[in-house]
Amino acid sequence: MDNIEKDIAQGYADFADDEGSIEEVETEENVVTENSTSFSFEETTNFSEMSDINRKLRAYFDGKIVRKDLTKSIKEGANVPVYVLEFLLGQYCSSDDPSIIEEGVANVKRILADNYVRPDEAQKILSLLRQRGSHTVIDKITVNLNIKKDTYEAEFSNLGIKAIPISEDYPSKFDRLLCGGIWCIVQLEYEYIEEDKNASPIHIRKLTPIQMPHVDINELKQGRKAFTKDEWISVMLRSIGMEPDTLKPREKWLLLARMLPLVENNFNLCELGPRSTGKSHLYKEISPNSILVSGGQTTVANLFYNMARKTVGLVGLWDCVAFDEVAGINFKDKDGIQIMKDYMASGSFARGKEEKSASASMVFVGNINQSVDVLLKTSSLFAPFPPEMGTDTAFLDRMHCYIPGWEIPKFRPQHFTNDYGFISDYLAEFIRELRKEQYGDALDKYFRLG
C-alpha cells in the first residue's frame, strides 16, 4: 500500500472516534440491508485463477484497480459519481476472496448511506452538525486562496457552504483541491464564538480525499512496460467497462478512438451511428473532466465567454465538451456557429476587444436512423447535423476524426466486463496528464503527409 492509500486508511480509522462517524453507525442493522441491491459474489468467472493481465495489474497498480461488476452492482442505488464509487471499492475490495469483497461492498454502502450529502438534505446536515458539535460528510470540496485575508477557504458543493477556513497543508498536499475540486470525507466541527461573530463557526478537523489526490505519470509509464500492446488495450477497454474478448480488433480500436478528445487538446471528433452503442457514455460517466451538453441548445456565453460577467464558458472549464444528439444543436446567437468554427480551427475565439484561448476538445455524437447505403445515396454521412453545419464544408473540414458508429455493435450484457480495470478516476487523471505531452510529430518518423 503506497503513501496515498496509507493516508486514506488512516483517515478512515481516525473517523472512528468522531460522533456521527462511519464506525459509530456500523451497529445500525438497517443501514446496509435495507433497500440494498442483492448481489452474488460467486461469479461465473473464476477470479482466484488470475489471468496474467490481472496478476500484473495487482503487482503494478494495486489500489488503483477495481472489479467492474462491483461497480454495476452498487451504482444502481448510489447517487454518487462512478469515479467516487470505484475509488472506495478499490480501497475496500482489492482482494479475490469473496467474503472480503462482500464485506468491502457492505462497508462502501454503509459509508455512502451515512455520510454522503444529498443537496436537498443540506440544511438537515448543518442542523445536525450544530446539535452534535461534529459530523462527518462526503462532499465535493473546492479550495480557493483568499488573497485579501491570505488564507485558504473551502467550498462544499452539495452542502452549499463556502468560505470555510482550511489548513494550507491540504491544498499543498492535494493540489487537485485547487484545480476544480475533489470528493472527500471531511470531519466538520461547529463552535460559535460570541466575541467573533464574523468568523465561521464551522471548522474542518480532518480531510481525506476519496478521489486520486494526484497521479504520478512516471509511475504509470513504468507499470505500462510490463504489459504487451494487446494486454494494455484489454486493460483500457475494461477500464471503461467493456469486455475486449467479445470484440473484434477493429471494434476495439474504434472504442479506443472515443478517448482521443480526452487525451489530445483541441481535438474535434464526430461519431454518428445507430442507437444503443454507448456513444455518449464515456463523456458523461467515465471522465469527471468532460461534460455532455444534452439537447444541443446553448449560447455563446455559456459555451465560450460571458461578456457581462467576464467569465470563460465550458471550453475553459472542461477538457472535453460533448454535444449529444447533434440534430438538436441550436445557438440562440446568430454568430454562434461562426465562433465555434473559429475555435475548432485555432483553439481561440474573439469576444469583445480581446481574444481568448482554451484547450477543450469538441465531440459531436448523434443517431443515424437508416442504413449507411441509403444515407450515401440520398444525402451524406453528416446528414444528422443541422443544415447550417452539415452542409458547411468549412465546418466539416475542421473535424479531425469521424468514427463510423455503425461498425460498433449494439451493446448487450455480454459486452460489459466483470473483470478488473482501472478506477475511473485514476484513468481520467492519467489521461488528463497525457494532454500535457505532445505527440504531434510522432508520425514524422514513418510518414510524410501532404
Q: Which residues make up each language-model segment?
A:
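Extended, charged/polar low-complexity intrinsically disordered regions
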Residues: 32-239
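Helical mechanochemical/support elements of P-loop NTPase systems and associated helical scaffolds
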Residues: 228, 232, 332, 336, ...
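Conserved ASCE/P-loop NTPase catalytic core
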Residues: 243-374, 379-383, 397
